[in-house]
Amino acid sequence: MRIKKRNTRGNARNFITRSQAVRKLQISLADFRRLCIFKGIYPREPRNKKKANKGSTAPTTFYYYKDIQYLMHEPVLAKFREHKTFAKKLTKALGRGEVSAAKRLEENRPNYQLDNIIKERYPSFADALRDVDDALNMLFLFANLPATDQVSSRITQSAQQMCDQWSAYIAKERCVRKVFVSIKGVYYQASVKGEDVRWLVPYKFPENIPSDVDFRIMLTFLEFYSTLLHFVLFKLYTDAGLVYPPKLDIKKNKLIGGLSAYILESNDEKSSLAVKPKELSENVEVQELGANTLKTALKADSNEHDEEEQDQDQEQNVEDVELDKFEDTNKNQGDQLEQPSKFDSPVATLFSEFVFYVGREVPLDIVEFLILSCGGSAVSEATLDQLTDKQDIDLSKVTHQIVDRPVLKNKVANRTYVQPQWIFDSINKCELVPANLYLPGEPLPPHLSPWGDSTGYDPTAENDEDVEGSDAEEIDESADEDAESEEVEEDDTAAVALNEDDEDDEDELRQQKELELEAQGISYSEAKDVIDSESSDKKKKKKRKATEEEEEKDLKLIMMSNKQRKLYKKMKYSNEKKDEKIEQLKQKKKQIAKTKAKLAKLDKK
């Protein structure tokens, strides 16, 4: 029998440690990390670490052996090796003081491109769109970071430029569908080519960069994601018939900045097909023409000239002739079908008839992006402050003014004054919500996430039992009897009356049964015993049914496989936790309502 070698099959064959992979690829650990990020290869967790590590129990990182074999044929790997030799030659030249040689080496620095990796990882454009949300989150994060020793200003500026290009396309094509303002930032969701893309834009506050962040890893991800977003933006702009990259108006960028500084030009203009005159080179031989050839050429030219004149006369005659006009005499025009809109969502045309005047206290980048994405127009008060001839600007077409201050001294007629949350809630509900709930200085309704659990807690739905219970507690606590407390007492008495009515109905049914039994010749005591026995039988039946259901559940659990049983227990546990969370939120809502009622009473006093 052939003796089998140890550690050549199973986990020992399928996995390889990180140190072994670095030795196999002959690159540094930093280059190995960059290559794994570019190729999308990440560490794996074997079932048996001891067997995968060939008997050793030392903590280590494992990768699939096939993934490392796949990396060995990567063209970027060769560029990493070339860069390693380039760095050695450069340090040697600088050490010797050979400045000209070092300059020549720097000019011939080896560069690599990630185009082939992008095409490998994302074979179709839909695959790239599904993964573009991570790229957007990373780029918007770096666009908000200050320039430091680790992150240069060139990186932040290029990230900001790409983010503006993405926002300009989304606003031009009106792709925004949902928005949510949270503590971390503003979440947007857009529908791009049928794919839902969700990304986070942080607020423009001064950032304190923590010291424990590894910017080398983050910059590697940024390099890959910026290349991916370049591909995506080029495809989106060209499909929409726009020029990429879009031009930037320098004057507007200095004054206003943002989306209004970008000029989106159409790419549908027909290219002029002008024939360029051919230049004769010195090497071309010029043939001498004889007299006969010259005569025939002149005759041909004269004939062509006569034919052209005849054609022009015919064209003029055709233009002078008036064509017959055919008028439709039929009075019944029939059903006229409405043409389908260019935009498939009602959100795209939500603000198409409105002009918004944005106050200087409102963040313009958030509000302007949403207004333009919904077809509206925006005028910024902060922008008008920077203009010298702002008195010549006509603001009579303004329909809404967005204000985020409690009191307004002067108001303009024919304008609707709302707070910024009115825009967010209108977009999430795909309709214009009532503006009277969002007046300046008014307490706003709760701003809910559009991606919330529809089957869970609904904060908009009022729980009558909770309201009644909280009102009853307020009545007991409060000694003053004002109009509100009287209304609450009326509600409580109505609820008690309903319960008493139910009890009266049961008593009436019981008395009716007793009368029927007495009519059959059964005495009152015997009739009472019969009714009690019937009610006890009903209780026993209910109890028996409940036990049967429990036994049936237990039998189903027994018949399940181990995997199904674990999954069922997880589902049951998650549902119980969800119910607990819903109950906590209800209690919290009840407590908030109670404190609000107390504060309202104190204000009245």
Swiss-Prot record:
**Any one Gene Ontology BP term:** maturation of LSU-rRNA from tricistronic rRNA transcript (SSU-rRNA, 5.8S rRNA, LSU-rRNA)
Q: Which GO terms describe its molecular function?
A: ribonucleoprotein complex binding; RNA binding
List the biased-composition ranges (Basic and acidic residues).
Answer: 526-537
Comp. bias regions, Acidic residues: 461-508
Q: Annotated region Disordered: where?
A: 449-553
Q: Which domain of life is it from?
A: Eukaryota
User: Where in or outside the cell is it found?
Assistant: Nucleus, Nucleolus; Nucleus, Nucleoplasm
Q: Which UniProt keywords apply?
A: Coiled coil, Nucleus, Ribosome biogenesis, rRNA processing
> Looking at the keywords, is Iron-sulfur present?
no
Keyword set includes Metal-binding = no
Question: To which protein family does this belong?
Answer: Belongs to the pescadillo family.
Stated name of the protein: Pescadillo homolog
Q: Which organism is it from?
A: Kluyveromyces lactis (strain ATCC 8585 / CBS 2359 / DSM 70799 / NBRC 1267 / NRRL Y-1140 / WM37)
Q: What is the lineage of its organism?
A: Eukaryota, Fungi, Dikarya, Ascomycota, Saccharomycotina
The gene it comes from is NOP7
